[in-house]
Design a protein with these regions (language model features):
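AMP-forming adenylation/ATP pyrophosphatase catalytic core
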Residues: 1-216
Length: 216
């Protein structure tokens, strides 16, 4: 135990250099330059910071080979208890295990908080005489706002979590594949299906807090 403590103290400064403060992700830029002993020790420190029970040597080595050093264009992940270790844009993320909500449809009510699936918070849709305002309070307590045109009389308003296809974001913009839009907005792949999407009937209008689609 004392040896472990001493090792942690010796590595503390190096460790802090690699941690992205705002989201506690691990920057992997210099990881390949470290010895395998140091790699495992830094990874252990990071998991410890998240309050994760210390993984076995085999698990640490699997995370290093299968996640950290996975192919550049892969979306690698490794399960540790109820958490997933993921890599995106050369950073290591730890997330809970998410439920697949890509097929969920929630019919919208106005002026009444709507509970979103899988602990994603609440969405409030407010109508004014000219606009509709969407306010999403996410699971971390952050509020995201989007202003939309009012739906036409008789239009069903839906909240969904998956869309594949093209979107146009400005009057003079081109139709872009939504995957490209998410990439430009730096939204990680696993987060893309956890953002409330507002549809009027079957037409995507908005990803709340991220963009509103320009309708011709």
């Amino acid at each position: 135990y004392e040896q472990q403590q001493l090792l942690n103290e010796l590595l503390a400064e190096e460790y802090q250099k690699n941690i992205v403060k705002n989201d506690r992700t691990f920057n992997l830029q210099h990881f390949a330059n470290y010895s395998s002993v140091k790699q495992r020790a830094l990874l252990r420190l990071w998991l410890q910071d998240w309050g994760i029970a210390l993984p076995s040597l085999v698990q640490l080595e699997q995370i290093i080979s299968d996640v950290i050093f996975a192919k550049f264009d892969a979306q690698p992940q490794f399960r540790l208890d109820d958490n997933i270790v993921r890599r995106y844009q050369n950073r290591l993320f730890l997330t809970p295990m998410f439920t697949d909500i890509s097929q969920e449809y929630v019919e919208a009510k106005f002026n009444h908080p709507i509970s979103l699936p899988d602990h994603l918070g609440t969405l409030l849709l407010k109508k004014t005489t000219e606009k509709m305002i969407a306010l999403w309070q996410d699971e971390n307590g952050n509020t995201h706002k989007e202003t939309l045109a009012l739906p036409l009389e008789g239009t069903k308003v839906w909240i969904r979590f998956r869309y594949s296809g093209k979107v146009k974001l400005t009057p003079n913009g081109v139709n872009k594949d939504i995957k490209k839009v998410w990439q430009q907005l730096n939204v990680a792949p696993w987060q893309r299906q956890r953002i409330p999407l507002i549809f009027y009937d079957d037409k995507l209008q908005s990803a709340v807090g991220f963009f509103t689609v320009f309708q011709n």
